Swiss-Prot record:
Enzyme class: transferase
InterPro entries according to UniProt: Elp3/MiaA/NifB-like_rSAM (IPR006638), Methylthiotransferase (IPR005839), Methylthiotransferase_CS (IPR020612), Methylthiotransferase_N (IPR013848), Methylthiotransferase_N_sf (IPR038135), NA-bd_OB-fold (IPR012340), Ribosomal_uS12_MeSTrfase_RimO (IPR005840), rSAM (IPR007197)
Subcellular location: Cytoplasm
Domain TRAM residues, every copy: 373-441
One example GO MF annotation: 4 iron, 4 sulfur cluster binding
Domain MTTase N-terminal, chain residue ranges per copy: 6-116
Residues of the Radical SAM core domain: 133-371
Upper classification of the organism: Bacteria, Pseudomonadati, Pseudomonadota, Gammaproteobacteria, Lysobacterales
Reactions listed under catalytic activity: L-aspartate(89)-[ribosomal protein uS12]-hydrogen + (sulfur carrier)-SH + AH2 + 2 S-adenosyl-L-methionine = 3-methylsulfanyl-L-aspartate(89)-[ribosomal protein uS12]-hydrogen + (sulfur carrier)-H + 5'-deoxyadenosine + L-methionine + A + S-adenosyl-L-homocysteine + 2 H(+)
GO cellular component terms, A-Z: cytosol
Gene: rimO
Function: Catalyzes the methylthiolation of an aspartic acid residue of ribosomal protein uS12.
Name of the featured protein: Ribosomal protein uS12 methylthiotransferase RimO
Amino acid sequence: MSQLNPKVGFVSLGCPKALVDSERILTQLRVEGYDIVPSYDAADVVVVNTCGFIDSAVTESLDAIGEAMNANGKVIVTGCLGKRPEQIREAYPQVLAVSGPQDYQSVMEAVHAALPPRHDPFVDLVPDYGIKLTPRHYAYLKISEGCNHRCSFCIIPSMRGDLVSRPVDEVLREAERLVRGGVKELLVVSQDTSAYGVDLKYAERPWRDRLYQTRMKALCEGLSELGVWTRLHYVYPYPHVDDVIGLMAEGKLLPYLDIPFQHASPRILKLMKRPGAVEKTLERVQRWKAMCPEITVRSTFIVGFPGETDAEFESLLDFLDQAQLDRVGAFAYSPVDGASANALPDQVPEEVKQERLARFMAKQAQISALRLESKIGSVQQCLVDVIEDDIAVARSRADAPEIDGLVHIQNGGELGLKVGDLVDVEITDSDEHDLFGDALPSGHAVQPGRTLNLQIV
């Protein structure tokens, strides 16, 4: 491109939903002829997409803004922390503009004001699947914004608003474009995937000569037509989640559910304003495993929530023993500015929270190690993410990127595997988190995807 093109640096922080927001902004910048550069020095202006969910994320976002201000001086701030402009401007009064999440138009207007485009837009500069910040072989597919729940520890609705679902045909067309661009795995994300379409009264829309409801199961049926891995994230434990387990058993969806249970004590769940029928939750987990023996269930939990007693924490450990979840993430409760849980009595001392977190993770590590050990001798279909020397680092159908385990393919170099290859791997060993094995010579017939060479500062 011409050296005259205006140059934008970009910092993307936060969750996969925020990453999708960044991809949309970057796509529009490229459509309008802006160059995206990987350093502050080379940038004419810097956009920082922030996170503001928990205190540590706020600190990280403010630090990133400060770094960009010190190194460049021309900074536009957007994202969740942008819902608190006074906090940003108190720390950095010289930022050019502040906007909230999903406010793409305000970001572009701020960029135009600071750095007008120097030529007419060239749509052909951008592939039809847009600019991606993930490797080319997988992509996050955001199906809605906002959330209708009011969990006491969460401030997402105040930042991103109530649930707004994207029409199902719009989502399916985006998925088609991504697959045409080389994507082998679609990761469905939202604040509440199982509530998808409720705000649109499950309206029907046409796609590929068929009507689809704007509903989780119908969306999954449509995505299954694309012939790539489809993985569900952020699934709220509603009863109708059972409807998609059959699709997993039929091989139409990856047998994987990311479903945050948060706790096992009915009283604590009530304080969290979460569903509290723990016995039903256990029954459903067992039913899912009976319907689809291959299913991987990932969940997240909060330990040390205000009022959590020793007995209630022990009940959480008992739940882990009974549920035998495959993948688990946990956090020690941390107050979030604006969350109603901050006002709850009987706050748990920090040292107790950390001790409980350590015990919780040690318990789950034992469970995970045994579940992974049971896969030794099996053959797992894997997607190659990285080539390191002679070893291919991949993920099985049970592993989402960045949050789950890896499969280390010892003979990856010998077979000439490439990033984006789908390959069958015979598992020979395991540890608490990862699997190790050898690719079967006939297992990597799928053509590899090409890694997107895009950097962000």
